Amino acid sequence: MSPSAVQSSKLEEQSSEIDKLKAKMSQSAATAQQKKEHEYEHLTSVKIVPQRPISDRLQPAIATHYSPHLDGLQDYQRLHKESIEDPAKFFGSKATQFLNWSKPFDKVFIPDPKTGRPSFQNNAWFLNGQLNACYNCVDRHALKTPNKKAIIFEGDEPGQGYSITYKELLEEVCQVAQVLTYSMGVRKGDTVAVYMPMVPEAIITLLAISRIGAIHSVVFAGFSSNSLRDRINDGDSKVVITTDESNRGGKVIETKRIVDDALRETPGVRHVLVYRKTNNPSVAFHAPRDLDWATEKKKYKTYYPCTPVDSEDPLFLLYTSGSTGAPKGVQHSTAGYLLGALLTMRYTFDTHQEDVFFTAGDIGWITGHTYVVYGPLLYGCATLVFEGTPAYPNYSRYWDIIDEHKVTQFYVAPTALRLLKRAGDSYIENHSLKSLRCLGSVGEPIAAEVWEWYSEKIGKNEIPIVDTYWQTESGSHLVTPLAGGVTPMKPGSASFPFFGIDAVVLDPNTGEELNTSHAEGVLAVKAAWPSFARTIWKNHDRYLDTYLNPYPGYYFTGDGAAKDKDGYIWILGRVDDVVNVSGHRLSTAEIEAAIIEDPIVAECAVVGFNDDLTGQAVAAFVVLKNKSSWSTATDDELQDIKKHLVFTVRKDIGPFAAPKLIILVDDLPKTRSGKIMRRILRKILAGESDQLGDVSTLSNPGIVRHLIDSVKL
């Protein structure tokens, strides 16, 4: 064959290969489009799961007097309409009915001068009223049902639990309130830092602080000393309350040592109250600064009156990470927050006073504040306080607790459910779980397959799952199904707005409301509600810039959402988790899902980074399964893995979504609640490793250096 013929043959072969590649790309694009259409179809027509009659699940003793608080979906729709159209009537009547006031309020809210609706700019509720949070949580129940269980405690080790009645709780709280007042000099309006594990004394502490009109600032008892120091100083805390040590998952945590380290740089702190949990004599005690819980309590009587506070007086600060990385001290008022906690307890979970409410959350987060402490005690039921973890001493611990204490409502994060699902169903066997009447999910959207496992294995496909969407800033639920036979459920959807929440989906670019049959944009709320946070401590400008200024007239949640043809709301994740590549808006969650489907992948986090050609490009941080077996892989083998994962995305979604970078790492930067901090990944990719902001919420701060080194490689 002549050279020209050979060249011609090669060109034909290349042309053929190009045609094949084009055909594959076209097929891939078509597949991606089909997948999108399929996902749209799923979103808009996923099977609705009706709630079964609840009374069939009740114990006979409860079934004799139980009836749901709402009479089906139409009753919810009627009341929700009233709460939006006449919030003064709705919330005024509820506040009068469910809260005890030392001085009645004379105005429900301050109306917006333009709309007449509750104002974001002047958000104040139940004006000129006075009340006390502790009285509403403890005293009124101790007077009526003194011997009723208020707190059921389950220690880290099985068999270490005990119960506290409302009468006993009142006496304990009154003594600690006097310790704060007379031994420690705390006054109304002072801030008290709390660094305690999940023990009854932590709940007693919060109630004692609120009893004297002070402000509690709980710091999760897993934060480092530096993080604790920063929160003590920012919150202007005068005293700190802690334990000598704590127990979790069979391990001893040196709580007091962390406090001592933090207090080296906290000039405003006068005293530390120490509850000796383990009585370890080697734990340092610095008198006269440090005071012993038991010794001080003995000095005081078992009753001490409440201090009335104004409706808008601060109840607590709770620090949450912001998009800039600097923690925000979110400030909640007293009356509005209490009403939000109580109403969601009543209607979301269909709670009754005979119930045993188990929230598997920590008081260091908003879930613990609202649904371990305030919600259950406001309602007068029993709250179950669990010190341990779902995996210790084995994966049946939650189910053991539910059966032993006849728990009626169980509220937990999908992170824990995924762990328990992975552990296997054998740990659920031999458990009745018949006391359960409602299952809850909190903290992140729950995947449909986890929802279905939760429903089938724990709920026996007989009881509702309330997939709740809310935030530290909201104080209580924003979007949620309602138990008690009210809301037909769609697995993966948070369903409908709670009372008083006028939830809308906005076009992220124009800020206009989207009212189509399938609206997808950013989730916002159109008017204020009682439990909405009032400000960021000492930084109201940041409060405005973060929540109210992005879309004037709305509260900006920071989350993307879709509303389907039936009005169900689907939470799509943070709006900063969207990558714009060559004009294509790509959901990082969608790309992550494609990668995670591969059997060699354990975890994945996708973020965007700047690209000169496409504006943004996609980077995927990937954790492989069986990491030990990959540690000896050659560079060529690792490159093959990366190419394979890129091809997976191209195949599942389309070429436009293919990651430009695949970075293999040992772990991802996660908070202690299991959320991936993608902000850190974005900063590292942008070459801003020295501007990571607050990384104290990471469960493994040491992973940051590994991630930086992996990107450099």
Curated annotation (Swiss-Prot):
E.C. no: 6.2.1.1
Motif stretch (FACS): 552-600
Leader peptide range in chain numbering: none
SUPFAM superfamilies registered for this protein in UniProt: Acetyl-CoA synthetase-like
Any one GO molecular-function label of the UniProt entry: AMP binding
Taxonomy, superkingdom: Eukaryota
Matching InterPro entries: Ac_CoA_lig, ACAS_N, AMP-bd_C, AMP-bd_C_sf, AMP-binding_CS, AMP-dep_synth/lig_dom, ANL_N_sf
Reactions the enzyme catalyzes: acetate + ATP + CoA = acetyl-CoA + AMP + diphosphate
Presence of the UniProt keyword Cell division in the record: no
Residue ranges, compositional bias (Basic and acidic residues): 10-22
Location relative to the cell: Microsome; Cytoplasm; Mitochondrion; Nucleus
One GO biological process term: acetate fermentation
Function text: Catalyzes the production of acetyl-CoA. Provides the acetyl-CoA source for histone acetylation in the nucleus. 'Aerobic' isozyme of acetyl-coenzyme A synthetase, which supports growth on nonfermentable carbon sources such as glycerol and ethanol. May be required for assimilation of ethanol and acetate.
More details: Present with 2890 molecules/cell in log phase SD medium.
Family that this chain belongs to: Belongs to the ATP-dependent AMP-binding enzyme family.
Protein's name according to its UniProt entry: Acetyl-coenzyme A synthetase 1
Organism from which the protein derives: Saccharomyces cerevisiae (strain ATCC 204508 / S288c)
